[in-house]
Each structure stands twice: as structure tokens, then as C-alpha cells.
Amino acid sequence: MCARGAALLALCAAGIFLSSTRGSESPHAGGPLAHEAYVWQRVWNQPVRDAIKQHASQFAGLTVLNAEVSWKGEQPQVIRVPLDYSVLTNAPCPVGLALRIGPCAASVSANDTATVFLADVAASLVTEASSHRLVPRELQIDFDCAESKLDGYRAWVEAFRRKVAPVPVSITALPSWLEQPAFKRLAEAADGYVLQVHSLQRPRAYDAPFTLCDPAAARRAVERAA
């Protein structure tokens, strides 16, 4: 893979997919982990298309960035990514859509206007994909959520699931969330979650050694989640 192409497909060594069993205790998970990839690009130029065409067959699935939400005060602002559906519908593996949501300073709850707005955005992504004959395997929510807001985030996830059913809704999660009582409720509200095990520790200084993914720390986090 060329240097440019290498930047386009991010291996899921940085994110491990773990299915949550809703409403029941699940047994300890085991076995090999599937290799999947993210396409986290706002601009779909030819190198992005070529990377997918040439390398998607190496993965069990792709998740493509479809929209990003930032906040101006308490008002959400959306940037949509114009996907090339002709490439995605011909991909040799299942394709999921990702909705990225930046940190939210406001409270997170079930009945506020932001929840309704975000659920409508989520539904519109699935509808647009379906109109281009792409049936997404899931909608993945990547929300920079404060640990104090995990219960409110659960209300968002429940709203998203109602809007996009029967498409599954998964979330990304941090290892630090695993210790929070609210996380169990959040995970049970989703159809699955991706444990983000990259950059678990912030560098102590600007010139300190930096590791994108520590395999030993990642394995410990996965064992805790499993």
C-alpha cells in the first residue's frame, strides 16, 4: 500500500468490536478477533477510492465516516461526508456508517432538542445510503462523551435505535468507561460496541515517546471488556 493509501484505511487494532448482549449476562468472549477497517476521510478523492478497491477484501468489514457533529454553544453543527456509493456498493465486505459527535458541553438527555436533531441526522444517513442501494450493516456512533454523561448518552442511543431500526446501532467506548456503573446500561442499550484501545495514555511531555497502540495494554483492556 502506498503512503497515501496507508493513511486511508485504519486497521482495527485501534478498535476492537465487542457485541453486547442486551438484557442478559453474556459469557466470557474468546477466539480470534476480526480484522476490520475505518475510512475516516471527509474528502473522497481518487486515492481513497483506490484504497478501498484494492484493500477492502483484506478486511471483515469497513466503517466509513458519514457525518461529523460539532457544537456552537449548545447548537449542533453538521458536516456531511459525500460518500461514493458506487465504490461502497461494490465493496467485497459489509459496510457500516459512522456518525462522529464531538464533545458536548450541554446536558445530555432524552427529551431535549439536540436528541431529536441527532436522531434525525442518524436516520437521514441510513435513508440516504438505502436510496443508493447500500444496506449498512450498522450505524456506529463515535461520541466524545464525558464519563459523567454516560446515562444521558444511553438516552441518545435509544433514540437512534428507534429511528434507524432495523439497522443495528453500535457505539465506540473507552477502557476507562468499563469501570463506570452507567456504562453497563449504555452498552445494553446498544447493539454492540467498539473498544478504542489506541493511545490509552496521554504523553507526559511534548517530547515524550509516544505509542499509537500498546499491544499489551490493548490486550488487558480487551480482557476486561470480554
Question: Would you name each region that the model predicts?
Answer:
Residues 43-51, 75-87, 176-185, 218-221:
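Alpha-helical scaffolding within the catalytic cores
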Residues 45-72, 128-136:
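Catalytic domains of carbohydrate-active enzymes, especially glycoside hydrolases
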Residues 38-42, 67, 100-104, 144-148, ...:
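Active-site beta-loop-alpha junctions enriched in small/polar residues
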Residues 62, 141, 193:
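Conserved, mostly hydrophobic/aromatic
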Residues 43-54, 113-130, 177-183:
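Short, acidic/polar
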Residues 23-54, 65, 80-82, 91-93, ...:
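Boundary/entry segment of secreted carbohydrate-active catalytic domains
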Residues 158-226:
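Substrate-binding surface in catalytic domains of secreted glycosidases
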Residues 77-146:
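Substrate-binding cleft of extracellular glycoside hydrolase catalytic domains
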